[in-house]
Structure formats: structure tokens, C-alpha cells
């Protein structure tokens, strides 16, 4: 892709997100979502093959449907309230429709079907943008709606997302699909405390973006997209492979890695608000995520080939990608759990 075109597209994607985050007028919010959606489609189709075309089409149809629902909710609200700006008094029907539209944009259950399919059909850099930056705008919309959102609807969506994010990843061998189901589960964890503690939700979103970015950069450095190719990486890039497995376990929420911090804080917040059953269910379903990450770590690091035939191994023919930023990202993504006591300020 031409560097100038790439710069224009990325600027539009960022501008759309910033418009959504800073606007107080519903029409501008809708325009920001549209700019964001239309600008990212060329990035999804960058490889220009049938699979990426199909992924971009699925993404467009899903996001366009969510945008229509969002506009419907905005119009219903303006019909009842007589204004287009954010207000604490919002029509209940409009609030429910708007919540469903934003959950569809985020890829939360039961509107999650597009996330694994789209992620699998696009390149790793495009997948990184879709699973990190593209989550910020819908989350800022939910953050704005937090005081008036339907709590029961949000809790049902969050527990469904955590469960489906765990179940869906159990039989996957494609790393991009595993990351997609992990994204669905993490989004479910974050939305569960959105009403109770929105600031903590933003912290968890930051940690999720940090860990997902690090994992994708490791996969890009190793040029691997399947569990088999990751298992064959030991003789090619042993440090990258080890770091990838540590990041996978951190995403699964295994203590003492960073990924345990958001789960710990969210369960503590839920129990503080007398949601004991929900906290228990989410802790149990989190084991599904941890299981497939542990299985991935086992198959790639603790099982070796029965023979020493070098022809089975993956040889490094091309120069490796630059990894100068990776050490700092890996340290932040795996070793910041001791900072948890300083987060008491969020309560």
C-alpha cells in the first residue's frame, strides 16, 4: 500500500475514534463511527485475496447494521426528549437498542460471530488494529451510557461473552481465532463492571490493549499464525517463542502474570456490589480460557519431536523483523501484577 494512502487511512481511523470520544452530540458520535468503519475496510483488504475480501465484507455488513441500530436509538431518543445531546434522562427503549448496537460493534455475545471469521481472514497487523484500536470508540460510547444503561442486559451479555470466549477457543488451532475468542472473553469481563466502576473498566481496557498488542507483535516477529508453526519455532527464534507462551498465559489470567490483575480487580468489584453468583460464574468460565492457553503452552514447549530429523523443522530464510520495542512491552505485559495495591485509588 502506498505510504501516503496508508497515512490518510490511519489518520481517518484515529480521527473517527477521537470524534466519538470527545463529542457530546449523538449525530457527531454516529459520524465518528461511520468514518472509523469506512476507513478501516481498506486496511482489512490490504492483502487483496478472496479471504480478506470476504472478511472485509462481513465486517462492513455487521458494522453497518450496528450503525443503523445506533441511529434508530438516537432518533427514538430525540423523539422523546427533543434533543440530540447526551442527557442523563434517556428513553429506556432507546437505551436498550443503543446498548445492543454498541455490543454488536464490540463483538460481544450474542453478536460475536463475525469476530473470529474476520480476524482469521485478515493479516496480523490488520487483526491487531481491529482487536485493539477498534474497541476504543464503542467502549467510550458504553462509558458515556454507564449511568443510564440497563444493568441486567449488560450483565447477561458479559457472562455470555466470557462463556463463549472460553468455549469457542477450546478446539482452535489458528492463533488469530484464539486471539479473537480471547478478545470476546476480555470484552465480557470489562463490561461486567462498567456500571459499578467505569474507571476500573478503562484500566482493564488499557491492560487488554497492552497484552494483545504485545502478543500480536510477537506473532508478527515470528511470522506464525498456527499452533503447529509456533511449535516449530524453537530452533528459529527460541526467545520469541518463550515470550509468546508467557504472553498467552498472561492473557489467560494465570498469576503471577499481569493478566491476573484485571480478573482479580473485577471479581473483587463484583463481590463488593453483592454480585456473588455472577463473580463465581465468571471465575469458573475463566478457567476455560486458561485451559486452552495452558494446552497451547504444553503442546508448543513441553512436547518435542520424537526424531531429530532437521527437515521437519522450520528454517529461517528471511531476515527477522525489528523487535526493539518488544522487551519493554513484554515486561509490562507480564510483570506489573505487584502494582495492583496502587490501584486502590480506583475504588
UniProtKB/Swiss-Prot annotation:
Its main location: mitochondrion. The chain crosses the membrane at residues 1-21, 25-45, 59-79, 96-116, 145-165, 178-198, 202-222, 247-267, 276-296, 326-346. It is a multi-pass membrane protein. It is found in: Mitochondrion inner membrane. One of its GO terms (cellular component) is mitochondrial inner membrane. Its EC number is 7.1.1.2. Disulfide bonds: none annotated. It comes from the Eukaryota. Keywords: Electron transport, Membrane, Mitochondrion, Mitochondrion inner membrane, NAD, Respiratory chain, Translocase, Transmembrane, Transmembrane helix, Transport, Ubiquinone. Belongs to the complex I subunit 2 family. Core subunit of respiratory chain NADH dehydrogenase (Complex I) which is composed of 45 different subunits. Interacts with TMEM242. Core subunit of the mitochondrial membrane respiratory chain NADH dehydrogenase (Complex I) which catalyzes electron transfer from NADH through the respiratory chain, using ubiquinone as an electron acceptor. Essential for the catalytic activity and assembly of complex I. This is NADH-ubiquinone oxidoreductase chain 2. The lineage of its organism: Eukaryota, Metazoa, Chordata, Craniata, Vertebrata.
Amino acid at each position: 500500500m502506498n505510504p501516503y494512502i496508508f497515512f490518510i487511512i490511519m489518520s481517518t481511523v484515529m480521527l473517527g475514534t477521537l470524534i466519538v470520544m470527545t463529542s457530546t452530540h449523538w449525530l457527531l458520535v454516529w459520524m465518528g463511527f461511520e468514518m472509523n468503519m469506512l476507513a478501516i475496510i481498506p486496511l482489512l483488504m490490504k492483502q487483496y485475496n478472496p479471504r480478506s475480501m470476504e472478511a472485509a465484507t462481513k465486517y462492513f455488513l455487521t458494522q453497518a447494521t450496528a450503525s443503523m441500530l445506533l441511529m434508530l436509538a438516537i432518533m427514538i431518543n430525540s423523539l422523546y426528549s427533543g434533543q440530540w445531546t447526551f442527557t442523563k434522562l434517556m428513553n429506556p427503549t432507546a437505551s436498550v437498542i443503543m446498548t445492543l448496537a454498541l455490543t454488536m460493534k464490540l463483538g460481544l455475545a450474542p453478536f460475536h460471530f463475525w469476530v473470529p471469521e474476520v480476524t482469521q481472514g485478515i493479516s496480523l497487523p490488520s487483526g491487531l488494529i481491529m482487536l485493539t484500536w477498534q474497541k476504543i470508540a464503542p467502549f467510550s460510547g458504553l462509558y458515556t451510557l454507564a449511568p443510564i444503561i440497563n444493568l441486567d442486559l449488560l450483565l447477561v451479555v458479559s457472562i455470555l461473552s466470557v462463556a463463549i470466549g472460553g468455549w469457542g477457543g477450546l478446539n482452535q488451532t489458528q492463533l488469530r481465532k484464539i486471539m479473537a475468542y480471547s478478545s470476546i472473553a476480555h470484552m465480557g469481563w470489562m463490561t461486567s463492571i462498567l456500571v459499578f466502576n467505569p474507571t476500573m473498566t478503562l484500566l482493564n481496557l488499557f491492560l487488554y490493549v497492552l497484552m494483545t498488542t504485545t502478543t500480536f507483535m510477537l506473532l508478527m516477529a515470528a511470522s506464525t499464525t498456527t499452533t503447529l508453526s509456533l511449535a516449530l519455532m524453537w530452533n528459529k527464534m527460541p526467545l520469541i517463542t518463550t515470550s509468546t507462551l508467557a504472553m498467552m498465559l498472561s492473557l489467560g489470567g494465570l498469576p503471577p502474570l499481569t493478566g491476573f490483575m484485571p480478573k482479580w480487580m473485577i471479581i473483587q468489584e463484583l463481590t463488593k456490589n453483592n454480585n456473588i453468583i455472577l463473580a463465581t460464574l465468571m471465575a469458573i468460565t475463566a478457567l476455560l480460557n486458561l485451559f486452552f492457553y495452558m494446552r497451547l503452552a504444553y503442546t508448543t514447549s513441553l512436547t518435542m519431536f520424537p526424531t531429530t530429523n532437521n527437515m521437519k523443522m522450520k528454517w529461517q530464510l528471511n531476515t527477522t523483523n525489528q523487535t526493539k520495542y518488544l522487551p519493554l512491552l513484554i515486561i509490562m505485559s507480564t510483570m506489573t501484577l505487584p502494582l495492583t495495591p496502587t490501584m486502590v485509588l480506583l475504588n
